[in-house]
Amino acid sequence: NVTQQRDTRIDVLSVILSSFGFGGLLYGFSSVGTYGWTSATVLISLIVGAVSLFFFILRQSNLKRPMLEFGVFKFAIFSLTTFLGMLVFALLIGTETILPLYTQNVRGLSALDTGLILLPGALFMGFLSPIIGRIFDKVGGKGLALGGFTILAVTSLPFMMLSLDSSITLITVAYTLRLIGVGMIMMPLTTAGINSLPPHLIPHGTAMNNTMRQMGGSIGTAVLVSIMSSSAANAALSDPMKSAVHGMNTSFIVSGAIAVIGLVLSFFLKEKRKNKVMKQELSSSSSSS
């Protein structure tokens, strides 16, 4: 075990509040594409989630041993890497949601064909993961994040210009490169963020990072799908398929803007190696004793 093990008691109220808080927000945002922002289902879910999450945070701040330590956000590097991770997950899930709508609803391809279009990206990302890990050990996460967000921004361009007869090969290549960019960001950013925390906060940081990523994916998908739907409706073109494609193009323009924001924020990354963090904590512990 890399972290100190201790017996803890489950705080039932915290479990209930966190379930309603995170669950309500996730369900609310994920339902926007189906019901719309003004739906009672969405609004009630978001309100219940927000209120429950507020009381959950208050509860954690008053517990001696909180279930989820929000103090991890006091560390600037962790906060930044977590936010960037949310942006990446929003772009990833958003693309994986909108692209099949294009291939199946607009181009009339089967679910199998769509899966084959998406498959190379998943394979390349999995294959390159250990290689990216070795690169991270040598150069750190900042350079990888800058490169990854650059790829995400550039690969948004082909999706901004989708048409009724866009090249499927180009779409496949662009999506594959997009997932390579995601792979260059996700693991290095997560590692850099966790490395910035003292050892006793690592479990809380890991849990918080995973939770925020899911929130980012849910919120990002809701926003991108909402933009796609409203833009398609406002286009009011004679051909419904052209209106749908227009909405998708607009959604990917926003996606590209998000990637540029991530690229700019990546310049502010300042990594702290784990051995330095441990030395600082050990020295503070020895001085206090």
Question: For each predicted feature, which ranges?
Answer:
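Pocket-edge structural micro-motifs
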Residues: 19, 55, 161, 287
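12-transmembrane solute porter fold
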Residues: 13, 26-27, 38-48, 52, ...
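Phenylalanine-glycine-rich, low-complexity intrinsically disordered regions
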Residues: 3-4, 19-42, 57-62
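Interfacial non-cytosolic loop connecting adjacent transmembrane helices
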Residues: 237-241
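Intrinsic disorder in cytosolic terminal tails and internal cytosolic loops
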Residues: 269-289
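Conserved aromatic/hydrophobic "specificity hotspots" at molecular recognition or selectivity sites
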Residues: 1-18, 64, 74
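Intrinsically disordered, low-complexity segments used for protein-protein interactions
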Residues: 1-4, 118-122, 280
